Each structure stands twice: as structure tokens, then as C-alpha cells.
Amino acid sequence: MDKQYVVALDQGTTSSRAIVFDRDANLVAVSQREFTQIYPKGGWVEHDPMEIWASQSSTLIEVLARAGIHSDEVAAIGITNQRETTIIWDKLTGKPVCNAIVWQCRRSAAICEALKAQGLEPLFRDKTGLLLDPYFSGTKIKWILDNVPGVRERADAGELLFGTVDTWLVWKLTEGKVHVTDPTNASRTLMYNIHSGEWDSELLKALDIPASLLPEVKSSQAVYGTTRIAGEGTEIPVAGMAGDQQAALFGQLCVEPGMAKNTYGTGCFLLMNTGKQAVKSEHGLLTTIAVGDDGGISYALEGAVFMGGATIQWLRDELGLIRDASDTEYFASKVDDTNGVYLVPAFVGLGAPYWDPDARGTLVGLTRGANRNHIIRAALESIAYQSRDLLDAMSKDSGVALKQLKVDGGAVANDFLMQFQADISGVEVLRPAQTETTAMGAAFLGGLAVGFWSNVDEIRHKSGIDRRFVPLMDDKERATLYLGWQDAVRRSLSS
């Protein structure tokens, strides 16, 4: 039967999803299953790897049924995933040695501090482009080896395997035949040298992690193995893989240097493709790996804002100022400006470019005339201001003045926010017609790997624009407003 579809598996932090795309990159069907969030202690976050697999495999079966298609019509299954989340399992039984340690989990903070005290942060920064932070996989692995009884001995004996979620899914899909990851996921582990494209023995020694745990690193645009849906039917290639933010970058076809996208979710993730040059940031950004137009390694600068959509949730859940996130556009548009009010949502500290974990939220500029609408508008504007901070840092690091910003994520439906983002940044904001850009990135990678699409040029026109938001604010007003934001941020910083 003619293969007319590609399936993307989108394994996220709170749910597993499967999406079917046709040859024109139209979304045909979606299936989604949430799974349990486990919080054993303050600052600890876990997932059950078997529940991740159960939720993801069931969505795969379900989405084909919803689309009304058979497995022999599927050209490839591509994968995108929550990055950094760490799983270790027995290579013979497939049983995890403990729950997955999620990217949000802070339990390995003491390990990071010990490595910093040894003066090792510059080494890790130079080789991986990352900071020594519990966010990344390497110190999570070390924590498991040091704290779960018997695991280090089993690891040293070669009995165990490590993987981020992509690796775990491929291993399960191929029934334990394939232990593999891609460069985008490997680059988030603190163990992968982004310049040589290899696991780094010096970093492994510093972390005391045996190399036998690690998966083979293959191209993001490769065929890794095959799978049968529910153990039946045609063998489908498992092909194409990238971490969620890099998949979104590719789904937005930001494959050339200077192209950037911002994902507006709980937080915001802004990535700029820097081509074949790994740009070392001097302004608080991470250097990471992206997927090039040939499927090979490109580099990117990445900045993360901790509180994006979560700021709007705070307005709703803690302050009761709105009933639904969509209400913000209505209330913000009822006033001409914020009446001098700025909200800095540093509720869990500030991420890039400040990296101040002890910064705290501030609401400044309040006068007797300030009302609910001004505060709601200030909350929305804070998302755009924080993104402007990242854009400015990227321009300084890369030497490229951005002209366009591609956007995705739930908050891009808010026209007020998108227009203010364009205004305060002085760049054109492009909202795609297809908002499932992360899944589309995985689908594109899978389809390209098996020849479903021949090259990036063939898929370029399949990614249309819903609306262009052009800057309408004059330079003087933009500068004045941004100075006010910078002053508000200074008040929120810990020192």
C-alpha cells in the first residue's frame, strides 16, 4: 500500500501525544494521554518510565484508529521528547532501576556545587556549552549511581543502560534491539562534546559515569530501527529524532544562521540557529546543538524564561483576576498602557540572561489609579519583555540583528501578546498556520530520513504563516518602556 503518512510521537513533561501528518504536512489526527507527576520530596520530580511507555504506545495505536489508517500506510515514526529527563534500566529485563528523574528535579544540586568547587565548570562549559546545573542529565545519572543501592556495581558490570526519553522510546519500540540517541538530546547531558560530536571521556571521568551506560549517537535524520504497532502488522521505520525545542526549531524551518523561534509555553524557550559555528555566549545563554538543513549538526544559542504562561496561571489561580487565560487579551486591551505598572515574575528566580535563582517577583509602579486591567496587561507584557531580554542577548552574542521571530506554543493565540512582542522587540513576529511545530519537526525529520520528502526545499512551502505582526511602536516609546522594565528587573535581583 502507498505510504501517505508520517506519525510524530511527542513525549512531553505532562503528557504523551501522537500526531499523524499527511504528505502536505496537514494534521490528520491527534491522540493524547496524561501521566502521573511524582513529587517524593520538595524540589524532586519523577516519572514512571513504564507509564511513559504505556501512555506513548497507547496513543500510537489510538491515533492510527482515529485517522482511519493502517500501519502499512505509515512511512515513518519520528520522535520528539522532553529533554534531560534521565532513565537507567537493566539491559536484559528492561526494568528501570528507579523512576525517571525529570529535567525539573533539583536533587543533584549538591553534586553540581561540588563540581564547581573543584573548578570544573569552565571545562563543562567549554565542551558542552552548558552550565553545571541540576537541569541537565549528567548529575542526575551520578545521583542514581551514588544513591540507589546496587546500581553502581551493576553499571560497572555493564548490566545497565542510560537514556533520555528518546532513547527509552526507541529501545521499547524496537523491543530492546536499538540503544541510540541523537545529537540534540546528547547535547543536554553534560557528557557530550558538542565540538567533536562524541561522548567525552574527561567529562565522564569527572562525573564518575561508566561509558558502557551510554547510547550510540546517530544523526537526527536517520533510520534507527523498525517497530510493529502492538506487535502486529508491517514493520515501520523508527526514524528522525530531536529534543522538543530543537524539533520546534526544525518544524519552524529555522535551518539557516540567524533564524530564530520562541516557544511560549509554561516558560519560554528561544533558540537561534548559528549554523556551523558554536557561539560561546557572553550574555548568559547556552550553546547547544540544532539540526541543519542537511540533517547534520548545526549549532544554536538557547535562552529560557522560567515564567511565561505560568505567569498567567498565577493571575488565574492565585490572584483570581481572570477565569481563563484567554481573558487576558480582553482585559489588557481595555487600557491604553499599564499606567506605569511592571510585573517581574521572578517567582522561581530569573533564568537567562540573568541566572539569579534568588531573584523574587516584583510588582512596581503602583499608584492609586492602577487597576486590574493594568496588572493583567503588565503580566502579559512581562512575557514579551523577558523574550526581548533573550533576543538582545542573542544579537550581542551572534552579531546578528534579528529581523524576524517565528513563534509557537499555546500563548501565540493571544494577538495582544504577539503584537506587543513585535513592538517591544522591533522585529516582525510570524505566527504559523500549523501550531503543532514541535511534532511537525519530528515528522519532518522522520519523513526526510526515509525519503518521504526529498529535502528541506520540498517541505519549505508546507509550513505556512497565519499572521505577521509588524512593529507599530516608535523607537522612542520602545526605548522608554524597556528602560522601565530594566529598572523593575534590577529591583527584583538578589544583589
From Swiss-Prot:
The keyword Kinase applies. InterPro entries: ATPase_NBD, Carb_kinase_FGGY, Carb_kinase_FGGY_CS, FGGY_C, FGGY_N, Glycerol_kin. Its EC number is 2.7.1.30. GO terms for cellular component: cytosol. It catalyses: glycerol + ATP = sn-glycerol 3-phosphate + ADP + H(+). The keyword Nucleus does not apply. Pathway: Polyol metabolism; glycerol degradation via glycerol kinase pathway; sn-glycerol 3-phosphate from glycerol: step 1/1. Inhibited by fructose 1,6-bisphosphate (FBP). Sn-glycerol 3-phosphate binds at residues 13, 83-84, 135, 244. ATP binds at residues 13-15, 266, 309, 313, 410. One of its GO terms (biological process) is glycerol-3-phosphate metabolic process. Gene3D superfamilies: 3.30.420.40. ADP binds at residues 13, 17, 266, 309, 410, 414. Keywords: ATP-binding, Glycerol metabolism, Kinase, Nucleotide-binding, Transferase. One of its GO terms (molecular function) is ATP binding. It is an enzyme of class 2 (transferase). Belongs to the FGGY kinase family. Key enzyme in the regulation of glycerol uptake and metabolism. Catalyzes the phosphorylation of glycerol to yield sn-glycerol 3-phosphate. HAMAP family: Glycerol_kin (MF_00186). This is Glycerol kinase.
